[in-house]
């Protein structure tokens, strides 16, 4: 019965003058480790009235909330109401308790760079208020022209290559979402892009045998260089001593020759 009522609501939305809105066929694209959020909702957007487990919609309640309005003001039409599945005559009004607000999974993103507040623009509704015993996940039916914004979840950082947003557009009679240019990577991860060289392995990352071989080879080279240096030093010292001896002998011969020449005179 609910499915027939929902179909009737969709047909009414499309056929009533002034309420025409082209629904997007698919959901916004999913990005790994990222969530999306609409900062404002275009007129014609619908939100299913879903209740958490153990609760159901009241019989006279609406199946969905609808963003409607005029050129100056837009708001959500209808209200979602949930009642306990075990109690038929108990109807609970829309005033969520603080504990239930904490339990409810919110789709709102906390971003330091918020896009332009579209809710201040004509033809847009703000985030609809929560209702008591609401389901943990909200299901929206977006219309053409809707924009959603993406943000990485906690523990991941964004690598931007372009706009981190997706827009529902009509192309050749079919609706499609543009692909957001966002990549989310872990805080400790290093992404490998084309043209980026891998870091060379350090000696600490090599096997023990290879490291030992490297150290042994290096030590041998150092010892060989030290031995060659020592031999050069010894050879140089011996050469200097020999030259000094020759010079001393030459001086001695000259002195003796001079003394002998003086005695003869």
From Swiss-Prot:
Residues spanning the membrane: 241-259
Annotated GO MF terms: interleukin-2 binding; interleukin-2 receptor activity
Secretion signal, residue range per the UniProt entry: 1-21
Pfam families associated with the record: Sushi
Glycosylated residue positions: 70, 89
Chain ranges of the Sushi domain: 22-84, 123-186
Biased composition (Polar residues): 87-98
Residue numbers on the Extracellular membrane side: 22-240
Compartments (UniProt record): Membrane
Membrane topology category: Single-pass type I membrane protein
Keywords noted in UniProt: Disulfide bond, Glycoprotein, Immunity, Membrane, Receptor, Repeat, Signal, Sushi, Transmembrane, Transmembrane helix
Function: Receptor for interleukin-2. The receptor is involved in the regulation of immune tolerance by controlling regulatory T cells (TREGs) activity. TREGs suppress the activation and expansion of autoreactive T-cells.
Protein name as it appears in the record: Interleukin-2 receptor subunit alpha
Source organism of the structure: Pan troglodytes
């Amino acid at each position: 019965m609910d499915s027939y009522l929902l179909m009737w609501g969709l047909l009414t939305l499309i056929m009533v003058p002034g309420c025409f809105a082209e629904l997007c066929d698919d959901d916004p694209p999913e990005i790994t480790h990222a969530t999306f959020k609409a900062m404002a909702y275009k007129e014609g957007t619908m939100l299913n009235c879903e209740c958490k487990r153990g609760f159901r919609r009241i019989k006279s309640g609406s199946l969905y909330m609808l963003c409607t309005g005029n050129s100056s003001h837009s708001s959500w039409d209808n209200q979602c109401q949930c009642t306990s599945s075990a109690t038929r005559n108990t109807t609970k009004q829309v005033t969520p308790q603080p504990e239930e607000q904490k339990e409810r999974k919110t789709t709102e993103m906390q971003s330091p760079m918020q896009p332009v507040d579209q809710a201040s623009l004509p033809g847009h509704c703000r985030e609809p208020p929560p209702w008591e015993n609401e389901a943990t996940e909200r299901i929206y039916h977006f219309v053409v022209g809707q924009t959603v914004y993406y943000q990485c979840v906690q523990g991941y950082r964004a690598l931007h290559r372009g706009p981190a947003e997706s827009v529902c557009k009509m192309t050749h009679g079919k609706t499609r979402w543009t692909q957001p240019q966002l990549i989310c990577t872990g805080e400790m991860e290093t992404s490998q892009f084309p043209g980026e060289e891998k870091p060379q392995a350090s000696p600490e990352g090599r096997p023990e045998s290879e490291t030992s071989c490297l150290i042994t080879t290096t030590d041998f080279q150092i010892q060989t260089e030290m031995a060659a240096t020592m031999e050069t030093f010894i050879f140089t010292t011996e050469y200097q001593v020999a030259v000094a001896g020759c010079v001393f002998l030459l001086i001695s011969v000259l002195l003796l020759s001079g003394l002998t020449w003086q005695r003869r005179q």
